[in-house]
Amino acid sequence: LRAHAPGAHPRMTDWRLGTSSWSEPAWVGPFYPPGTPAGLFLPLYAARYRAVEADVTYYRLPSERLVRGWREKLPEDFRLCAKFPRSVVHGGSGASPDPGRILDHPEALADAQRFIAAMAELGGRAGPLLLQFPY
């Protein structure tokens, strides 16, 4: 969402509109040009919106290399938001949440630190980091 109108409320220019992902194959045709390879989804998405959520980070801890790759495909004024990994907010990778391991367990804390280090690779393109709890 871009507010460029004269006299627009100054905070309006800080608003960003985006979706919870950019990697949906079904968007090829309706959103991405027909035949677009997955490797071009993010830069094409970023040409139309100013923010996106990387929901993939909930399912697996991203590497610093992967996050650097995202950064290189994004304009400077873009913000990428990401979910903390399931291992941090769900207490592990099991089907049921483990309340004794959520946020306050050595393994969860180690994954949280690795996640933050990886997301730091976004630099100024980093948006909010989200905690999606299973409750």
Put a short name on every predicted segment.
Residues 2-4, 8-135:
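Residues lining hydrophobic/aromatic ligand-binding pockets adjacent to catalytic sites
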